[in-house]
Amino acid sequence: KVIKNELNLIKEKFSVPRRTKIIDAVLNYDIEETIQKESVVITITHKGYIKRGPLNRFKQQKRGGKGKSSIKTRDEDFVVQIFSVNSHTPVFFFSTQGLVYKLKAWKIPEGTSTSKGKTLFNILPLKNHQSISSIMPLPENELEWKKLQIVFATSSGKVRKNSLEDFINIQSTGKIAMKLDNDDKIIGVKICKDEQDIILSTKFGKCIRFMSKKLRIFKGRSSKGIKSIQLAENDSIISLSRSEEHTSE
């Protein structure tokens, strides 16, 4: 009873309307702002398994060391690409059917040094007949993309060069990167400078080399490209590479 009386006295003495309001509201924020920036290693296998791991997992060793396991592969699978980027780095995934997908590195599932990773079908909206032909890390600042050029090569020998700026806005479902004939597919995509050479290799062991600046920059993504090489019957392009700089030799 004493406590009750004291509380009533306090109520009478300090009976002031509340100055603040408590309301329901939706908190808007970018989840990426909560992701720590750190150096990570991305590993991809021939059968399409991918994973992310911290770079500090790989300690420096002296020359002649045994190295450290980075991934556990299944039978007849092997690592085809490994690169180190920032966790906020955008990464492009180009499918053989001409689509491009974009993921920030932190969205790639993290795995241990002994795990095989996750299949690309689990993290990208790929259809059953699709596979990824090229995986490309890009500058985090998209303003730098205007200065870069991207070269596509197909199995039939078509090539096309675009400004990387054409690929800034990519939906979660992907975007058409290059239109292809029904029997054609993308075999490689590279960032290339005018002072570099493009090198294409064929299934039958042929090779052609030409200057990147000889390719005009196409506007948009609707073109199928231009012919780069005269292929023999049943031959096809299997690899795209670039030289560090052009030489006349």
Predicted feature locations:
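C-terminal interaction appendages of subunits in large macromolecular complexes
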Residues: 1-244, 248
